[in-house]
């Protein structure tokens, strides 16, 4: 039966000489849904409705460039010999941590230029970011990437997955852990957790720090299953190192901001 399994078509649409891939469509959908949610919350929090539209116009291109640069840097042994492939982001190869660095840096500059609180913007954006990540992982699914080690078909059937997911995990003659799905579900739970924490009315900035902690815990765990991790040295996985660093820094910043009185404003404060 395996010999007849065909992967899902990676192409969403052909427009003459232009090919649009599912990878880009799915990531774009995540961005648009996240933008809609952030804009609604921004208006509720007393910000102009165009605030996040303006921010996204800067943050998304910069995040994509940073995500690609991060990935290419760790895979330079390959891309140094295939320079023409560096711009081909539709083939995959966007590192979330690189994109996050670019987006946060852009957000900080944007907030300063607009005279806004960075932490207020970050808190509003946090649920949108993690939901966008949950959606975006399905782009990896369509590209048959970001998977874990080999498993049996029976293992996947025991997870009660539909055949279209099981069949898509059949790559190079073997079935593989659907780690894209694990991370997508982890992030989806994180999205609802952040919505609940938003009602708790934490100190300003702590919702974003909660996002960093939650995402990093899940990423550390799931990254250990993957077979395509970006490596620092030997068996040291870059994403796991970054995840631990983010957890430690987020907790430390949470404690220091409260101890120093830097986090007096609440999420719901104007």
From Swiss-Prot:
Record field: transmembrane: 18-38, 55-75, 90-110, 115-135, 177-197, 205-225, 236-256
Entry GO CC: plasma membrane
Enzyme's top EC category: transferase
Membrane topology: Multi-pass membrane protein
Pathway, per record: Protein modification; lipoprotein biosynthesis (diacylglyceryl transfer)
EC nos: 2.5.1.145
Domain of life of the native organism: Bacteria
GO terms of biological process kind: lipoprotein biosynthetic process
Function noted in UniProt: Catalyzes the transfer of the diacylglyceryl group from phosphatidylglycerol to the sulfhydryl group of the N-terminal cysteine of a prolipoprotein, the first step in the formation of mature lipoproteins.
Stated family: Belongs to the Lgt family.
Protein name stated in the entry: Phosphatidylglycerol--prolipoprotein diacylglyceryl transferase
Lineage of source species: Bacteria, Bacillati, Bacillota, Bacilli, Bacillales
